[in-house]
């Protein structure tokens, strides 16, 4: 009888990918990146092991928001003090902190547990076209071919 293959943490080979976010819709980019971070693009996917690859996203400031999301989509967070509810729109994030906009979108698509937080650490977002990971020799991914 055959058993299902279960990957062990020592057997996993992690790759580095670089994705250009210029003129790519935020949600479509986020779903592809979340899938790569989880490792669901690998045939040996095991849900309880961090199998995901490292992803570098450049040009985050030029990501596209469709419809009226720039003004209508609101992100909330609370400071745990009375009256501490803060709200920022997606357009505000894109203008002042585009890295945070992509991180919020992608982290929302990862599991809400310790494994999901660990997988989220493999995401590296940069507002411009420069990044600090040239030594890892990242492989370029064309997001339009994956969507």
UniProtKB/Swiss-Prot annotation:
The superkingdom listed in its UniProt entry is Bacteria
Which keywords does this chain's UniProt record carry? Ribonucleoprotein, Ribosomal protein
Q: Kindly list the biological process annotations in GO that this record carries.
A: negative regulation of translation; translation
Keyword Kinase recorded: no
Signal peptide bounds: none
Q: Does the keyword Ribosomal protein apply?
A: yes
Q: What GO cellular component term, any one, is given?
A: cytosolic large ribosomal subunit
Q: Name one GO molecular function term.
A: structural constituent of ribosome
Q: Which Pfam families match?
A: Ribosomal_L13 (PF00572)
What this protein is reported to do is described as: This protein is one of the early assembly proteins of the 50S ribosomal subunit, although it is not seen to bind rRNA by itself. It is important during the early stages of 50S assembly.
Record's subunit section: Part of the 50S ribosomal subunit.
Q: Do you know which NCBIfam families this protein is assigned to?
A: rplM_bact
Member of which family? Belongs to the universal ribosomal protein uL13 family.
Its protein name is Large ribosomal subunit protein uL13
Q: By which gene is this protein encoded? A: rplM
């Amino acid at each position: 009888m055959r058993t299902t293959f279960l990957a062990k943490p020592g057997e996993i080979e992690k790759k580095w990918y670089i994705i250009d976010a210029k003129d790519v819709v935020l949600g479509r980019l986020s779903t592809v990146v979340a899938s790569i971070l989880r490792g669901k693009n690998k045939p040996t996917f095991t849900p309880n092991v961090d199998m995901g690859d490292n992803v570098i996203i450049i040009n985050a400031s030029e990501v596209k928001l469709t419809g009226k999301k720039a003004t209508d989509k609101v992100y909330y967070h609370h400071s745990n003090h009375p009256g501490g509810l803060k709200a920022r729109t997606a357009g505000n994030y894109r203008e002042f902190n585009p890295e945070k906009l992509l991180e919020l979108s992608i982290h929302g698509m990862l599991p809400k547990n310790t494994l999901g937080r660990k997988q989220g650490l493999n995401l590296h977002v940069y507002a411009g076209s420069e990044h600090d990971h040239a030594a890892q020799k990242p492989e370029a991914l064309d997001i339009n071919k994956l969507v």
